[in-house]
Amino acid sequence: MKILVINSGSSSIKFKFYDLKIQKCLASGMIEQIGDEVSHSKIETCDGKTIEENMEIRTHDEGIVILNRYLKETGVLTDLKEIDGVGHRIVQGADYFEGPALVDDDVITKIEELIPLAPLHNPAHLSGIRSSLRHAPCLPNVVVFDNTFYHNIPDYAYMYALPYKFYEKYRVRKFGAHGISHEFVTKKGADFLGIDYKNFCVISLHIGSGSSISATKDGICIDTSMGLTPLEGLMMSTRCGSVDPAIIPYMKRVAGYLSEDIDTIMNKKSGLLGITGTSDFRKVLERMHKGDERAKLAFDMLTYQIVKIIGSYYAILPRVDAIIWTAGIGENSAELRESVSKRLAHFGVGVDETVNVNCIKKPTDISSQNATIKTLVIPTDEEYSIAKATERILLSLKK
């Protein structure tokens, strides 16, 4: 099957086009800064053909038109009918969906209903879906949700100790995020180690501009660090992570902030950016190596928070077969992996310094010789997961 995967963000469209029959990504690209006077668009094919342009792209609909044009101009396909289906990443499906779903009016309505839970993401996802349906109405579209991996988390783990009516009326509970990535790397990790996924106990770390940690027991996720929104949990590039909620009324009272101001600060002006002035972890490391105390503080805060969550998940799992690092920082920062691992030595965690530093873009065991818990680095591939999930839905329709 040939599957087009679309990740439609608030001002961007990222895409990959797969031929799953030969297990190959034929093309990938992005359309950025949608709505700006000058937008950027690019496609690159597996055989090296590239188109890159700067122009005004006012809407996601115009972006989808450009995407379709690029697929034809690069020779990846001659007609959109060659595509078997389109898969869309959806951040928030709440408890409406237990897995991927074929797009119909009911699915669209439910994604719309969940906009209050994901006001930045779900409207953009809907724009991508509607544009895809408008320009290629003959193609089936499938939605793959970022939080269905957490569908089996027990109620005592996903509930907040707030009035129960908050949950009943407003769906206030933990939903999590990055589930597509966590599911991909945990399955990949079990396969890499030769362990049956249904007997695999693992702590997975998706550490990037957004970061989350999940605990998976016997192939079922039992807890994750993000909550009702992606703000909860670890400090991130621009998000504060978990803080005392009383900070909000306190800052309103003593500094005159509005709720909207604090929401923006906590999501877009905190985390690494709030502590150091930069959201780029690479620059944080550079500054730390030059003696910048704020950069060192941010690094130590992140290390501490990761260690603390791993420790709490170690306590709720019957055992830990592996710790898996993934995503932009997790895959590329040997220094952070080493710092965290040293603080977990009493659990039996350790990394081989040489292998850790020379880790390349493939699943790698970086454990030290004496470690009793495996430490793996596994590059995530959310788009491939979405493509495979889309394929499964489409094949089920043919039965």
Swiss-Prot record:
ATP binds at K14, H206, I207, G208, S209, G210, D280, F281, R282, G328, I329, G330, E331, N332. It catalyses: acetate + ATP = acetyl phosphate + ADP. Disulfide bonds: none annotated. Its EC number is 2.7.2.1. The active site is at D146. One of its GO terms (molecular function) is magnesium ion binding. Pfam families: Acetate_kinase (PF00871). Signal peptide: none annotated. Pathway: Metabolic intermediate biosynthesis; acetyl-CoA biosynthesis; acetyl-CoA from acetate: step 1/2. Keywords: ATP-binding, Cytoplasm, Kinase, Magnesium, Metal-binding, Nucleotide-binding, Transferase. It is found in: Cytoplasm. One of its GO terms (cellular component) is cytoplasm. Homodimer. HAMAP family: Acetate_kinase. Catalyzes the formation of acetyl phosphate from acetate and ATP. Can also catalyze the reverse reaction. This is Acetate kinase. It comes from Campylobacter hominis (strain ATCC BAA-381 / DSM 21671 / CCUG 45161 / LMG 19568 / NCTC 13146 / CH001A). The gene is ackA.
